[in-house]
C-alpha cells in the first residue's frame, strides 16, 4: 500500500525484493526470439483462460511485457539496499516534533489530526482546486503530432530507422514555423523519456514501446507497432499540462538538426522540478487524509484493472485479424463460385438458356461477396488505425499512473524521523555542555552547527515531501479525466459496428432481391 500518511517504516515488500523478481512473471522466455511464438505479458500469463478463449497472444502481450521489463529492470530504478525503502515517508506527527527545535516550520509536518481542517473531503476550496487542474487536461483531444517511418534505413554496420515527426499546430512558447517536421531516431525518443523521468519523477511519463522483441528489430509488423507506440508516447506527452511546456519537449519537436549532435553541444537542465520550490501553505490547508486512502486503493487495484484492459485489447486485436481472414475468404469464395459457373455449362448442355440465366445470377453473388470483402477490409482498417489505437492508449495511460505510484515507493522516502531524533539528542548534549565549564568552545560550536544543519535538512525534506504529495495529487486528479476515454472507445466501437452492419445488411438485401428472379424450374 502506498500509504502517504503512515508513520510506519517502509519494509521491503515481496514486490520490491530485487530487480529480478520485482515483476516475477516478467521473465525472458525462449519465445522472445520469435514473433510467431507465444510471448506472455506480466499481466496476461501464458494459457490464462478467458471463457473459452486462451490469452496467449504474441503481439500486444509481448509489447506490454517488454515495456514493463524496460521500466523495472533495464532502467535500474531499484538498487538493493536503497535506504529510502526503510525510512519514514512523511516523518513524525506534530505531537512528536519537539517544540524546542527552533527554526523548523512545523506547519509543514504531516497532520495527525484533521480537526482544524475541513471535515469533509470535497470542500469547496478543494473542489475548486481540483477542477482547475482537471480543466488543463483533455485526453480525448485529437493527436497533434504525427510520426511516420522513413523507408530508407541508415547506418553502415548497424542499421537504424528514422522517423518523420511532424506537429500539426503551433506549440506552446514557440514561434510559428513553416517547417514543422523533424527527423528523429528511437534513441531520441528514449533520451526524451529519460530526461522527463529525471525532471518529473512523480508525473505520468508514458512508456515507450520496446526497441525490439528478441530479434524483431527489422520485422515490418513489429516496426509498424513500434511507430504507433512512439506516436502514442509523444502525443500523451504533448497532452500533459506540465510536460507540454517543458523546453526539452519543445526542443525535441522543433530543433531541425540531429538531436544526438545537439545533445553533445548543448547545456540543458535536467534538475528535478521541485528544486528551489516552496510548498504553498494554502495547499496544506486543503489536504485531507482521505486523499491518500484513495491513492492506496487505486494502487492496490491498478494491476487488476490493467490486466482486464489488456485482455480486452488483445481480443480487439484478434477481432481485427479475424476481419482480415473473413475478407480474404469472401474474395476466395467469390472466385470459387465464378469458376463453378464457368464449368457448369458443360453439365447442362440441354438447358443452356436456363443455366446461363442461373450463372448470370451467380455472377451477382460473386460481385456481392467481393463487395462484402471490401466492407470487411474497411472495417479491419478502421479497427487497426483507430479503435485498436484507442484501446492501447488507455493501456499507456494506466501504466503511466502505475509508474507514478511505483516511483513514489522507490524515490519519495526521507529520514526525517532519524534527523529529528538526532536533533533531540544533540540538544540534550548542548544543554549539558552549557552547564559544564570544562567543555571547549570549538566542540560546543561544532555541535550547535550540526543541530542547525539537521534542522535545515528536516525543513527541506518536509518541504519536498509536501511538494511530492501535491504533485501526485495533481496527477491523480487529471487522471480522473481519462475515465471518459472508456466511454469514447466503446461508443466508437458500437458506432463502427452499426455502420458496417448496416452496409452488410443493405448488401445482402440487394443480392436477395436480385436472386428472386433466379430460375427455380423450366417454366
Curated annotation (Swiss-Prot):
Mode of membrane association: Peripheral membrane protein
UniProt GO molecular function: identical protein binding; phosphatidylinositol-3-phosphate binding
UniProt keyword Transcription present: no
Compartments where located: Cytoplasm; Membrane
Domain PX residues, every copy: 141-260
Keyword field contains Repeat: no
Record InterPro entries: AH/BAR_dom_sf, PX_dom, PX_dom_sf, SNX8/Mvp1, SNX8/Mvp1_PX, Snx8_BAR_dom
GO CC entries: cytosol; endosome; membrane; nucleus
Domain comment as written in the entry: The PX domain binds phosphatidylinositol 3-phosphate which is necessary for peripheral membrane localization.
Function: Required for vacuolar protein sorting.
Protein name: Sorting nexin MVP1
Gene that produces this protein: MVP1
Amino acid at each position: 500500500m502506498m500509504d502517504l500518511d503512515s508513520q510506519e517504516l517502509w519494509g521491503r515488500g515481496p514486490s520490491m525484493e530485487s530487480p529480478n523478481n520485482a515483476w516475477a512473471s516478467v521473465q525472458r522466455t525462449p519465445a522472445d526470439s520469435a514473433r510467431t511464438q507465444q510471448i506472455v505479458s506480466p499481466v496476461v500469463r501464458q494459457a490464462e483462460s478467458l471463457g473459452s478463449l486462451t490469452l496467449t497472444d504474441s503481439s500486444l502481450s509481448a509489447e506490454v511485457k517488454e515495456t514493463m521489463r524496460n521500466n523495472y529492470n533495464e532502467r535500474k530504478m531499484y538498487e538493493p539496499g536503497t535506504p529510502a525503502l526503510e525510512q519514514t515517508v512523511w516523518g513524525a506527527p506534530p505531537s512528536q516534533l519537539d517544540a524546542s527545535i527552533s527554526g523548523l516550520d512545523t506547519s509543514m509536518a504531516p497532520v495527525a489530526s484533521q480537526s482544524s481542517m475541513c471535515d469533509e473531503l470535497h470542500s469547496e476550496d478543494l473542489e475548486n482546486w481540483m477542477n482547475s487542474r482537471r480543466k488543463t487536461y483533455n485526453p480525448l483531444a485529437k493527436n497533434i503530432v504525427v510520426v511516420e517511418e522513413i523507408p530508407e534505413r541508415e547506418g553502415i554496420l548497424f542499421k537504424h530507422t528514422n522517423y518523420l515527426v511532424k506537429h500539426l499546430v503551433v506549440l506552446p512558447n514557440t514561434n510559428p514555423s513553416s517547417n514543422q517536421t523533424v527527423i528523429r531516431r528511437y534513441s531520441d525518443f528514449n533520451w526524451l523519456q529519460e530526461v522527463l523521468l529525471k525532471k518529473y519523477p512523480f508525473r505520468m511519463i508514458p512508456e515507450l514501446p520496446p526497441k525490439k522483441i528478441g530479434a524483431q528489430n527489422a520485422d515490418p509488423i513489429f516496426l509498424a507497432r513500434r511507430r504507433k507506440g512512439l506516436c502514442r508516447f509523444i502525443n500523451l506527452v504533448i497532452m500533459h499540462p506540465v510536460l507540454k511546456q517543458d523546453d526539452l519537449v519543445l526542443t525535441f519537436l522543433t530543433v531541425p538538426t540531429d538531436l544526438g549532435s545537439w545533445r553533445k553541444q548543448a547545456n540543458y537542465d535536467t534538475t528535478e522540478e521541485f528544486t528551489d520550490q516552496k510548498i504553498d501553505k494554502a495547499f496544506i490547508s486543503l489536504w485531507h487524509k482521505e486523499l491518500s486512502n484513495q491513492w492506496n486503493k487505486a494502487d492496490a487495484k491498478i494491476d487488476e484493472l490493467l490486466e482486464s484492459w489488456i485482455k480486452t485489447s488483445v481480443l480487439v486485436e484478434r477481432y481485427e485479424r479475424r476481419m482480415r481472414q473473413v475478407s480474404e475468404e469472401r474474395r476466395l469464395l467469390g472466385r470459387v463460385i465464378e469458376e463453378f459457373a464457368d464449368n457448369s455449362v458443360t453439365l447442362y448442355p440441354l438447358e443452356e438458356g436456363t443455366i446461363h440465366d442461373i450463372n448470370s445470377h451467380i455472377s451477382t453473388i460473386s460481385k456481392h461477396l467481393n463487395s462484402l470483402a471490401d466492407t470487411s477490409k474497411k472495417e479491419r482498417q478502421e479497427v487497426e488505425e483507430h479503435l485498436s489505437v484507442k484501446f492501447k492508449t488507455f493501456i499507456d495511460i494506466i501504466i503511466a499512473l502505475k509508474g507514478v505510484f511505483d516511483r513514489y515507493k522507490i524515490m519519495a522516502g526521507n529520514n526525517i524521523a532519524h534527523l529529528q531524533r538526532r536533533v533531540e539528542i544533540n540538544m540534550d548534549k548542548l544543554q549539558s555542555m552549557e552547564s559544564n565549564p570544562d567543555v571547549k568552545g570549538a566542540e560546543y560550536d561544532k555541535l550547535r552547527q550540526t543541530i542547525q544543519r539537521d534542522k535545515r535538512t528536516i525543513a527541506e525534506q518536509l518541504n519536498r515531501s509536501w511538494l511530492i504529495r501535491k504533485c501526485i495529487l495533481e496527477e491523480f486528479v487529471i487522471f480522473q479525466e481519462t475515465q471518459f476515454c472508456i466511454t469514447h472507445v466503446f461508443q466508437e466501437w458500437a458506432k463502427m459496428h452499426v455502420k458496417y452492419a448496416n452496409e452488410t445488411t443493405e448488401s445482402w438485401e440487394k443480392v436477395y432481391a436480385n436472386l428472386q428472379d433466379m430460375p427455380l424450374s423450366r417454366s
